[in-house]
């Protein structure tokens, strides 16, 4: 199964759906779903996902290279792994999504969207995670969902962590720093993301890794993310990664800007970078007689997007943590 990406993009079902790799067994489950199980017993389970948005190709290429290293035997596997290429049709078309944004649908929220390939895929992925986690006795559960951002950023690589009732494990946060993430953003409320689903329903330590900017296949400079790729290789093979000399900056979400109607106006232009700072009192958005302003001394914007569909998030506002 050294042609997993090509099969996924072509929508082709392989003639052989399971086999042996170098020290592990592989099983093709469905388009964009591949399970890897080490020959030796392990108590760690990892979801490695990318391509939830079809125009975010750099992480997909990274996963493809990791799979090649595993199949060649140059990388040893020490986790049970479920590799997920989230939205095969959008990946093949080179577009963000075909009908609706899948990363708003998880946790059953797909039921509130018009039925589409994305709603069916979200349901399939939920069931795939349930089967994967229930079929093992993993003491450690991680989910790393790899993305790229639409906009440029003051932090080239950063992580977004779902709301979690329990404290985050220091080893997990330290690994994210070792993977080259310059900032970590902590959600304070539940959401429909893939990582919130895996965290809430299966207790996984989950993070959305944002790695640079969305570009088509073949146009990515993967050397920008070599530190992340090296950290993933070390993780898969069970090698300790050195702690980052510059721990990631930490932010928490303090508010969400939502577009409710066609009257919505977001006062940020196309050049506004993620993590741009705004002073207290700055007018951020208007919609009819509703005004959205900065309420803390300084707030930082994340994922500003005035073109989202009505009812969806047009941006997050953050505050820096000490």
Swiss-Prot record:
EC assignment: 3.5.1.96
Pathway participation: Amino-acid degradation; L-arginine degradation via AST pathway; L-glutamate and succinate from L-arginine: step 5/5
Molecular function GO terms recorded: hydrolase activity, acting on ester bonds; succinylglutamate desuccinylase activity; zinc ion binding
Organism domain of life: Bacteria
Segments crossing the lipid bilayer: none
InterPro entries associated with the record: AspA/AstE_fam, AstE_AspA_cat, Aste_AspA_hybrid_dom, SuccinylGlu_desuccinylase
Signal peptide: none
Active-site residues (renumbered): 210
Catalysed reactions, semicolon-separated: N-succinyl-L-glutamate + H2O = L-glutamate + succinate
GO terms, biological process: arginine catabolic process to glutamate; arginine catabolic process to succinate
Cofactor note: Binds 1 zinc ion per subunit.
Binding positions for Zn(2+) per the UniProt entry: 53, 56, 147
Keyword annotations from UniProtKB, A to Z: Arginine metabolism, Hydrolase, Metal-binding, Zinc
Cofactor: Zn(2+)
Family: Belongs to the AspA/AstE family. Succinylglutamate desuccinylase subfamily.
HAMAP family tied to this protein: Arg_catab_AstE
Protein name per UniProt: Succinylglutamate desuccinylase
């Amino acid at each position: 199964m050294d042609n997993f990406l090509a099969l996924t993009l072509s929508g082709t079902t392989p003639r052989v759906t399971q086999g042996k790799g170098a020290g592990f067994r592989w099983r093709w489950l469905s388009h964009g779903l591949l399970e890897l199980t080490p020959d030796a017993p392990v108590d760690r389970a990892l979801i490695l996902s990318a391509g939830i948005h079809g125009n975010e190709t750099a992480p997909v290429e990274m996963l493809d290279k990791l799979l090649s290293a595993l199949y060649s035997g140059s990388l040893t596997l020490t986790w049970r792994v479920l590799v997920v290429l989230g939205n095969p049709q959008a990946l093949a078309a080179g577009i963000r999504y075909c009908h609706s944004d899948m990363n708003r649908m998880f946790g059953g929220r797909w039921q509130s969207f018009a039925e589409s390939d994305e709603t069916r895929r979200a349901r399939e992925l939920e069931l795939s995670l349930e089967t994967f986690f229930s079929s093992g006795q993993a003491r450690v559960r991680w989910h790393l969902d790899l993305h790229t951002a639409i906009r440029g950023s003051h932090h080239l690589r950063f992580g977004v962590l779902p709301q979690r009732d329990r404290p985050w494990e220091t080893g997990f946060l330290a690994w994210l720093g070792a993977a080259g993430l310059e900032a970590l953003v902590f959600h304070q409320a539940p959401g429909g993301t893939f990582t919130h689903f895996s965290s809430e329903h299966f207790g996984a330590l989950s993070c959305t890794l944002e790695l640079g900017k969305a570009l088509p296949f073949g146009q990515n400079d993967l050397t920008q993310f070599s530190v992340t790729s090296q950290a993933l290789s070390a993780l898969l093979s069970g090698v300790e990664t050195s702690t980052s000399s510059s721990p990631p900056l930490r932010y928490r979400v303090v508010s969400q800007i939502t577009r409710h109607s066609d009257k919505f106006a977001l006062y940020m232009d196309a050049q506004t970078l993620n993590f741009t700072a705004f002073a207290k009192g700055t007018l951020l958005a208007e919609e009819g007689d509703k005004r959205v302003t900065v309420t803390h001394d300084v707030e930082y914007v994340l994922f500003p997007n005035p073109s989202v569909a009505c009812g969806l998030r047009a941006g997050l506002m953050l505050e820096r943590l000490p």
